[in-house]
Amino acid sequence: MTHTVPQNMKAAVMHNTREIKIETLPVPDINHDEVLIKVMAVGICGSDLHYYTNGRIGNYVVEKPFILGHECAGEIAAVGSSVDQFKVGDRVAVEPGVTCGRCEACKEGRYNLCPDVQFLATPPVDGAFVQYIKMRQDFVFLIPDSLSYEEAALIEPFSVGIHAAARTKLQPGSTIAIMGMGPVGLMAVAAAKAFGAGTIIVTDLEPLRLEAAKKMGATHIINIREQDALEEIKTITNDRGVDVAWETAGNPAALQSALASVRRGGKLAIVGLPSQNEIPLNVPFIADNEIDIYGIFRYANTYPKGIEFLASGIVDTKHLVTDQYSLEQTQDAMERALQFKNECLKVMVYPNR
C-alpha cells in the first residue's frame, strides 16, 4: 500500500485560553526510528479542557501557540529507515508519551515516571489535533480490523484503569468502588470488569454517566445527589466495605469518601488529580486499618492488554462516543465537552475527515 504524504497539513492551534485557530503547518519529518501517522481520531480529555480554559496544569504552562489532544489513533503514512515493526497502511493506536529508556524508572519498567518523557499535548510538546504526527515506533501498536479508530483512541484513558488495576492487584471476584464517572472513570469501570471484579460500585452526580457506567459493567450505581454513598456502600457490602476503591475525579470529598469505603486491609488508589496540593485524610483510619494507598500516574505497559481486552469483546466502548467533530470544528468540540458534561460522554475529533 502506498500513501502520498503532503508537504503541509492542517492543525488546530490554541492561541489563548478558549481560542483555537485552524492553521497550515509543515508535515513533520521523521527520524530513522519513527513513523508518520495520519491521525484519524482524537478524543478530548479532561487535561485538554484544563489547558484550554486555564492555560496551565500545575507547573506545565502554555507559553506559545499550542496544539492539544493526546488520545489518538490513525494509519501509518511513512516509516523511518530502521523501522521494522510497521508498514505504510497499518492501523495503529498511539501511546502518547515517549520516554528516554535510560533512566532508573525506565530500566525498572516504570517508564511512566521518566523525568524526561515527551508527552503529547503537555507543554511544550504539541499534541494530536493535527492531520499528521510522528512517533517513535516503540510507542505505536497495531490494532485489529475489528477495532474502530475511536475505540483505539480510547485505549489511552482505558490504560489508566488498567494501570490502577495492576497497581492495586485487583483480583477476580473483588468488590470495588469507583468514584467519578467522567471518561477516565468510565474506562476504569471497563478495566475493573476486564480484570474480573465481582461487584463494581460507582458514584457520580449525572444520570447519563451513571447509566453509561451500567453499560460498561457497573453492578451498582449511586447518584450522590440523592443518596449517601457511604451508607449505600455499607448496605451493598453488608458493612464490610470494599476491597479496593479508586477515586478518579480529583474531588477532595470523593477521595475522603473512597477512603472511608475501604474495608480493613483494603486498598485505595488516587487516580484523579485534585486542583489543590493538600487534602485532609483520616490518618488514624489509614493506620488502624492498614489501608494501602497507591498513587496512579498515567500508565506503563498497558497498551497490548488494552487492545486485547477491547478486541475480545470483554468490554464495549462504542456507546461512549456521543459527539463527533471535524478538525475545523475543534473549538466547538472543546466548548461542547466543557459546557455540556451532562449531555455528552466522549467527544471525538477527526483530523482527516
Curated annotation (Swiss-Prot):
**Pfam families found in the cross-reference section:** ADH_N (PF08240), ADH_zinc_N (PF00107)
Residues annotated as binding NAD(+) are V184, D204, R209, V271, G272, L273, I296, F297, R298
State the EC number(s): 1.1.1.-, 1.1.1.14, 1.1.1.9
Keyword RNA-binding listed? The answer is: no
Positions that bind substrate: Y51, E156, R298, Y299
The chemistry this enzyme catalyses reads: keto-D-fructose + NADH + H(+) = D-sorbitol + NAD(+); xylitol + NAD(+) = D-xylulose + NADH + H(+); L-iditol + NAD(+) = keto-L-sorbose + NADH + H(+)
Q: Which domain of life is it from?
A: Bacteria
A GO molecular function assigned to this protein is:
zinc ion binding
| Co-factor binding details | Binds 1 Zn(2+) ion per subunit.
Which sites bind Zn(2+)?
C45, H70, E71
Keyword set, alphabetical order: Metal-binding, NAD, Oxidoreductase, Zinc
SUPFAM superfamilies on file: GroES-like (SSF50129), NAD(P)-binding Rossmann-fold domains (SSF51735)
Q: Which InterPro entries match?
A: ADH-like_C, ADH-like_N, ADH_Zn_CS, GroES-like_sf, NAD(P)-bd_dom_sf, PKS_ER, SDH-like
Q: Does the keyword Nuclease apply?
A: no
- Cofactor(s) this protein requires: Zn(2+)
EC top class, in one word?
Answer: oxidoreductase
Function, as annotated, reads:
Polyol dehydrogenase that catalyzes the NAD(+)-dependent oxidation of various sugar alcohols. Is mostly active with D-sorbitol (D-glucitol), xylitol and L-iditol as substrates, leading to the C2-oxidized products D-fructose, D-xylulose and L-sorbose, respectively.
Subunit annotation: Homotetramer.
| Family recorded in the similarity comment | Belongs to the zinc-containing alcohol dehydrogenase family.
Protein name as catalogued: Sorbitol dehydrogenase
Lineage at the top is:
Bacteria, Bacillati, Bacillota, Bacilli, Bacillales
